[in-house]
Amino acid sequence: MTKYSAVLFSGGLDSAVLLAEALAAAGGERAAAPLPLYVSAGFAWEDEEQAMAARLFSRPPFAGAVGRLVSLRFDVRDVLPETHWAVRGTPPAFDTPDEDVYLEGRNIILLSKAALYTAAAFPTRSAAARIALLFGTLAGNPFPDATPQFFTTMARTLSLGLARDFVVETPFVMMRKSEVIRRGMELGVPFELTLSCMQPARGRHCGRCSKCRERRDAFREAGMEDPAPYRETPVR
């Protein structure tokens, strides 16, 4: 069976390790390399993420092994109010629970847009061709659009609606973020060029949002120092 693959890429450490893992699995064959896709929804941090991704792709293990980052648009600012924290760039604070950053329908948007793009980019309709959408969800994700049932059902829906054979793969679904970090170290991922922040500025993490706290805790659990720059050091 011919298998095409695309990685849903955000510029964060999870998707960076996921892409590095997929490149390693491709064995250096450019034709087998996954297609990195970034879906822009109109959120405040997206320009920073894409700028950092360009720097990341200039470094091993990505340089020369993967093509440019494909940037797609699926703007939701006509759905969310102008005062929404993701639009204004005023994210939940450091100690708030993960549930506070939930963006309804986020994974539906990402997978739908990725499927539409890959259906056109990989035009074969052969029954022996499969398109894999690689998604970096982790263990313990509390949201309804991050369950195994959701991903299986979504793949079935995309396959039916686009007359392709889609599968959504979640290789890290049983892993904690600290385990992903350790795997990334083995693969040589330059974590200083990954961005896991909802209020970044000039390539630096804010150190104040809950995503910065999550990243700090994961590096501590992994027994490693986070090499990324911060505007404020998350000390709590």
Each PLM stretch: what is its role?
Residues 186-206:
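Immediate flanking context of iron-sulfur cluster ligation sites
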Residues 1-188:
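ATP-dependent adenylation/nucleotidyltransferase module used to activate substrates
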Residues 201-204, 210-235:
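Iron-sulfur (Fe-S) cluster-binding segments and ferredoxin-like electron-carrier domains
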Residues 1, 235-236:
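C-terminal end-of-chain micro-motif
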